[in-house]
Amino acid sequence: MRRRSLLRAPLLAAPLLAAGCGFELKRPPPLRFSRLALAGFAPRSPMAAELRRQLPGTVQVLPDAASAEVVLRAREDVRERSVVASTPAAQVRELQLRVRFSFQADTPGGRELVPPVELLLARDMSYREAAALAKAKEEDELFREMTADIATQVLRRLAAVAL
């Protein structure tokens, strides 16, 4: 019994040590504005949905750009899928998935806050026709992760904006 309690002691001490050193879970960066408008996005854009999801609760997303402090304009929001490798029998063996997002941020008056920026993420994925359904799910998950990564990068750039 004593041996078991000695083995548990380090497990119980680890969270206390982590809390004592200032460790914190990653949070979205603080933004210096409270009203944002998203412009130029497709009606059901996964990127716009992810940006809304990641925005802190202190920022209100407005439908009208005129009443916002910052307007985030999507210039390009594209998901691409291309074949990288195939067999001599023309069966696909590897795909490359890309998410390309370009944007700029300005005030409703037209003052540029973030110049036009293009972000591109790519992931390679193996493919087998025998597992097509599983690979389709994996592809969706990779696109979702890349979209979340790009949204995080956009928010970091918006955090540097000074009005």
What are these regions (language model features)?
Residues 73-118, 125-137:
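Surface-exposed short loop/turn segments
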Residues 2-11:
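N-terminal export leaders
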Residues 133-163:
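C-terminal/domain-edge helix-coil "capping" segments
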Residues 44, 48, 94-98, 136-148:
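Solvent-exposed, acidic/flexible segments
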Residues 19-20:
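C-terminal motif of bacterial Sec signal peptides marking the signal peptidase cleavage site
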Residues 23-32:
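N-terminal, Lys/Arg- and Ser/Thr-rich interaction peptides
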Residues 31-78:
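N-terminal segment of the mature soluble domain
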Residues 55-59, 105-109, 129, 153-162:
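Sec/Tat-exported extracytoplasmic proteins
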